A protein has these predicted regions:
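NAD(P)-dependent Rossmann-like dehydrogenase/reductase catalytic/cofactor-binding core
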Residues: 160-228
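Soluble or luminal CAZymes and related metallo-dependent hydrolases
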Residues: 19, 41, 90-94, 158, ...
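Helix-loop-beta segment of a Rossmann-like dinucleotide-binding subdomain
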Residues: 73-86, 136-149, 204-215
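Short, surface-exposed alpha-helical recognition segments that flank or form part
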Residues: 15, 154, 216-219
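Rossmann-fold dinucleotide-binding core
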Residues: 45-128
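Active-site-lining helix/loop region of Rossmann-like oxidoreductase modules
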Residues: 100-181
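Short Gly/charged-rich anion-binding patches and loops
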Residues: 22, 44, 97, 165, ...
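Rossmann-like NAD(P)(H) cofactor-binding subdomain of soluble oxidoreductases
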Residues: 1-75
Length: 228
């Protein structure tokens, strides 16, 4: 546990459903210092993120991961790559130290056109997937809903269509989706083909399947869907 009046090279903030601001305030009140790495979803603007950070140096990043807390136990899975804001936009003096840390942990990273916009897009995709999954059962068992979705090409096709609708919300915020062609390519092909391809992918890729079943924090899911 971090102690009050302590200092770190980096502080990774990966908190649930919109509590980033509160997490930063907790650090500030306890005089815990270090470069903040915002490592989670948010539906806020860059200006708002800057206001959260205040006098902290910060950078935006996002893990390819899934999981949930059960009491004091974290059950999750983390891929070997993540999304990371480019050095030009981050404006932190220890960017090289951060990338060296990632290399030492055998983690690779990609730099999107804009990290805030990428997170909005990620939230829209999540909202499309989870809202489709919720159609088929009881919200008290998110893991079962995820399994039902991954095992049905027709439901996955509906998820593709829902994602397309959710992405229109992101576009309405002024995001040029053409700058994210690689990320959005799977959602451009005919929905029925994409649904079949995704079913095969989920069947063969154990880690991706694990992310879907472990990402079952209802409040986090609601935050994502309600924000979009």
């Amino acid at each position: 546990m971090a102690k009050a009046d302590s200092e770190y090279d980096f502080i990774f903030l990966s908190v649930r459903h919109g509590f980033v601001k509160e997490a930063v305030e907790t650090l500030r009140k306890n005089n815990i210092k270090g470069t903040l790495v915002f490592f989670c979803n948010f539906w806020n603007t860059r200006k708002e993120v800057q206001e959260w950070a205040g006098d902290y140096d910060y950078i935006l990043a996002f893990p390819t991961a899934g999981g949930h807390m059960q009491e004091d136990h974290l059950d999750g899975v983390l891929f070997d790559h993540l999304m990371l804001e480019g050095e030009q936009k981050a404006h932190i003096s220890n960017y090289a130290d951060l990338t060296a840390l990632l290399v030492s942990a055998d983690l690779k990273w990609e730099v999107p056109h804009d990290m805030v916009e990428w997170i909005w897009i990620h939230m829209a995709i999540n909202a499309g997937v989870t809202s489709t999954a919720a159609r088929s059962g009881n919200l008290e068992n998110p893991e079962e809903l995820a399994l039902n979705l991954m095992n049905s090409s027709s439901e996955l096709s509906l998820a593709i269509k829902a994602i397309r609708e959710a992405l229109k919300v992101v576009e309405a915020r002024g995001v040029n989706l053409k700058l994210y062609k690689a990320e959005l390519l799977p959602y451009k092909i005919p929905a029925w083909i994409a649904g079949k391809a995704m079913k095969v992918m989920f069947a063969k890729n154990e880690l991706t399947r694990k992310i879907m079943t472990l990402h079952n924090d209802k409040q986090d899911i609601f935050y994502c869907c309600q924000s979009v």
